[in-house]
Amino acid sequence: MDWYPLWNSLRIAAISTVIIFFAGIFAAYYIAKLPRLIKGVLDVVLTLPLVLPPTVVGYLLLRVLGPKRVIGAWVLEAFGVKLVMTWWSAIFATTVVIFPLMYRTVRGAFEAFDETLAYSGQTLGLSNAYIFWRIRMPCCRQGVLAGTVLAFARALGEYGAT
């Protein structure tokens, strides 16, 4: 029995999940702090891959990142890297498709966080980084874990965009 497809799927899902773990937390944290109007516009843009069929997302990525398109040609010329039909393009497409799951779940956890805990830390003279990693993240760990599991499961089953 050939196990290569399973290992390939696991590898792509794992790498995409690691990328999305940090990108999703970063985006959710900063967008949760924005004014309501800007937050709404960014929400629509960032969750678009969730509502579009995977084949449409894959087609759009091909149209944007193809070697004869502006972005694809620039990356090919500047770095010598082809952005389509490679192993890394599968990781990129999977990352684009799973991003909304991580982002929305973590943003919900950040918005449910009691800000008085962060304010208390500030009055005690704690740095923002310390407050984020030692107060906010432990309080939001269930949302972060849920988003990570959802993203990994979606990445493992992704076929259409890649």
Map each language-model feature to its residues.
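Membrane-water interface segments at the C-terminal ends of transmembrane alpha-helices
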Residues: 1-111, 135-160
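Short, highly charged low-complexity linear segments
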Residues: 82-83, 119-123, 161-162
